[in-house]
Amino acid sequence: MRLPLLVSVGVLLVALLPSPPCRALLSRGPIPGARQASQHPQPLSFFQPLPQPQEPQALPTLLRVGEEYFLRLGNLDETRAAPLSPAASPLASRSSSRLSPDKVAANFFRALLQPRRPLDSPAGPAKRGTENALGSRQEAPAARKRRSQEPPISLDLTFHLLREVLEMTKADQLAQQAHSNRKLLDIAGK
């Protein structure tokens, strides 16, 4: 009875006691691109309240693009305001400077969020930009007519295809599980 109590009290003391700051972090100079609150970081005690930042930090946003997830820190409205090309950036006038990581990330996400056009489209790059800006409000009448002539897809066919895809993925998962089980048994058997 006393031994588990002493062990748990010891673990709590070790976990709650303030530890000295990491020397590697204190001795290293400022990291380029990182924001420093002060020139000389002071070690924080566990019982000291955390310093409040001057501006509220934005929570990370998880963007889903296709099957991949991208983590974006900061305001998502900045991505729309950021220039897409480095030549349009105010930093491009200085030849020795590079884009900040925030601007690079903003350009990346802005490029991802732009609508895609097929490569064989007759519109040139300048016209594509204006069409993207206008949106799909002004569709060609021929495209509307062609779409109205196509028969709608049957819901039965859609659900049948969905069922087949689900069965195929389930069979694939079972095959992968059997393969990993076989590997584990081979390792354990040796």
Swiss-Prot record:
Propeptide: 25-147
This protein's UniProt keywords: Amidation, Cleavage on pair of basic residues, Hormone, Secreted, Signal
One GO term of the biological process aspect: regulation of NMDA receptor activity
One cellular-component annotation, GO: extracellular space
Signal peptide range in chain numbering: 1-24
Tissues of expression: Produced by the hypothalamus.
Region named Disordered: 33-53, 115-151
Family annotation (PROSITE patterns): CRF
Biased composition regions of type Low complexity, renumbered to the chain: 41-53
Compartment(s): Secreted
GO MF, one annotated term: corticotropin-releasing hormone activity
InterPro entries, alphabetized: Corticotropin-releasing_fac_CS, CRF, Urocortin_CRF
Modified residues (Alanine amide): A188
Cross-referenced SMART domains: CRF
Subunit structure, interactors included: Interacts (via C-terminus) with CRFR1 (via N-terminal extracellular domain).
Family: Belongs to the sauvagine/corticotropin-releasing factor/urotensin I family.
Functional note: Hormone regulating the release of corticotropin from pituitary gland. Induces NLRP6 in intestinal epithelial cells, hence may influence gut microbiota profile.
Annotated protein name in UniProt: Corticoliberin
Source organism of this protein record: Ovis aries
Lineage of the organism: Eukaryota, Metazoa, Chordata, Craniata, Vertebrata
Gene that this sequence comes from: CRH
